Structure formats: C-alpha cells, structure tokens
Amino acid sequence: SKKWFWQGMMKVEQQQKGSYREFIRAYAACAAFADAQIGRVLDALDRSPRRDNTIVVLWSDHGFHLGEKDHIEKFALWEKSCHIPFIVVAPGVTRPGTRCDRSVDMSVLYPTLLELCGLPGDTKCDGESIVPLLRDPTKKWARPALTTYMRGNHAVRSERWRYIRYADGSDELYDHENDPNEWDNIAGDERFAAVIASHRRWLPKNEAGQVPDLRRKPGR
C-alpha cells in the first residue's frame, strides 16, 4: 500500500499545481547547502597543520525516494533508500579521484578506522575492514552489503543483485545489470533460485530481541 506521506504529497499536488516540483527543489537546495558547509570544513582542514594526518569520512545514514516506486521517503529496502554516499580520504592510502564499485555497508566503518589508525580490533565485530579496497578499488570483494529496516526485514546487495526478505516471508529480487530502477521483481522466477539461495545465506541468523516501549511503563 502507498505510504501516507506519498498520498499526502499527491493530494497537495492535485490542490496546488507545482507543489511536487517545489518539494524536489527544496530537497536539492538542502543537499546543496549541506555540500557547501562540508566544503567550509574541508577548506579549514586544508589550511591546518593536520591536513596530512587526518582521516576524512563522509557518509549518510540513508538514501531517499523522490517519487520512485510511488515513495517520497526513506522507509524502504530498495536501492534509492539504501544507496548512500560513502567517501573516505586517508592520507597515504587513498588516491584522489578514485572510485570503488564494490557493495559495502556501514558495518565496515569501525574496523576500517581501527586498521587505518593502527589500533587493536574487536574480534566480535560484524564488519570487515575495507582498507584493501581503499588501496586498490578494483580488488575483488565477496561480501555483499546488508541493510535492515525494523525487525525481520533485510536487504542483501551484491554488485549485480538486490535480494529483499521481509518478516512475513515474502521476498524480492532485482537484477541491476538489466533493471537498475528495480521495476521487475523476479524472485518468483525459478531460473534465479540459485541467486536467491546465495544471497539468503547472508541474512542474519539471529536478531536482537524486541526493545520494550518504556513510554508505557508506570511513571514514564
């Protein structure tokens, strides 16, 4: 079903022609403003004596749908919600202007920073350092990216495929080589059973328990 925000946006668009366009412009303006402020911070770093001894990491916690797949929001496991900017500058490790097309998630951030800083790691950490990719963006990477939205709903993104498994047992599979906009869910096609199986093995085996709603406790 369509989300309330998208439904509300469509209603506003019908009543006030051009309101959707204004929403897109406002979103772009916010992104441009944030970009300018980040530039100010980086300019200050370039002028400082710590320029060559500072690791810079820029990332976002989520992407955003701007009407794609009938959504104007972030609450989904599709590409537009899960794909985020992730930029790392590590003096002596990364090279300016390089790009890596491997799929990673934010569990890599902690172990990566530990390795870059030469600090001891936590053996229980779920993530894996991507320093090898920072040194060589073309290096092979077997581990896909995992995204979770609420309990039991997960997406596994490899370089070609996005597999989504929902808490109700339903699933989706998209081939980004032939369907980059994720219009055609091919999870029901038996030809891709092996692809689904290879991605399912990356789903979490255990999940944390439900968080109690403290607002309902007496005295809260």
Language-model segments: residues:
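C-terminal cap/loop subdomain of S1 sulfatases and analogous C-terminal strand-loop tails that border
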Residues: H62-E68, T94-R95, D105-Y110, E115-H176, ...
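Active-site-proximal cap/lid insertion segments
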Residues: S1-S103, L116-K124, R165, E182, ...
